[in-house]
């Protein structure tokens, strides 16, 4: 019997703030490729997950879920603060990102465990911005439905980002724009 595929009891999972000792496991979770609009994307945080997050966050909160039986880091997310302009003033707003669940642990209510942690640690401002790929149905179901115990989700609209994959000729690029 494969222990990874059996239901997990809450008491085998620890949700805690990530430490430098978790750096390699965090980079492995983040690097798993995902597909959106037919393009495979892989996020890299080399050589250090924590150093790379300096670009996104001024104040960091990186969280891992560890399976105490296997001592494996099975999920993670970040919910730190970053500066944003609001009504012509710079204010710190929370930005939630890097939500990842190890493929072999999906469907084991890990997002519910994370939801409890988010609610417990969400301080002023008690909301977070986040970006979810439109076709990332697993993340959308986990975050948007309320079934997982995550805080209420409010859709602020669709962000469309264009990507230039080849410089081509100037005429083609100008025509595209």
Predicted regions and their residues:
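Short amphipathic alpha-helix that is part of the acyltransferase structural core
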Residues: 2-50, 62-66, 73, 95, ...
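Conserved acetyl-CoA-binding loop-helix of GNAT-fold acetyltransferases
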Residues: 101, 106-121
């Amino acid at each position: 019997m494969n222990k990874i595929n059996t239901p997990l009891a809450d008491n085998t999972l620890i949700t805690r703030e990530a430490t430098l000792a978790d750096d390699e496991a965090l980079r492995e979770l983040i690097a798993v490729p995902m597909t959106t609009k037919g393009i495979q994307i892989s996020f890299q945080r080399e050589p250090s997950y924590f150093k790379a997050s300096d670009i996104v966050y001024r104040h960091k909160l990186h969280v891992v879920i560890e399976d105490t039986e296997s001592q494996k880091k099975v999920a993670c997310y970040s919910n730190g603060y970053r500066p944003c302009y609001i009504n012509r003033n710079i204010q710190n707003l929370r930005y939630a990102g890097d939500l990842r669940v190890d493929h072999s642990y999906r469907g084991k209510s890990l997002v519910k465990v994370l939801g409890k942690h988010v609610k417990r640690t969400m301080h002023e401002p008690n909301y977070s911005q986040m970006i979810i790929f439109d076709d990332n149905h697993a993340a959308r179901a986990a975050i948007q439905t309320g079934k997982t115990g995550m805080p209420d989700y409010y859709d602020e609209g669709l962000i469309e980002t264009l990507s230039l994959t080849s410089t081509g000729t100037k005429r083609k690029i100008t025509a595209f724009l």
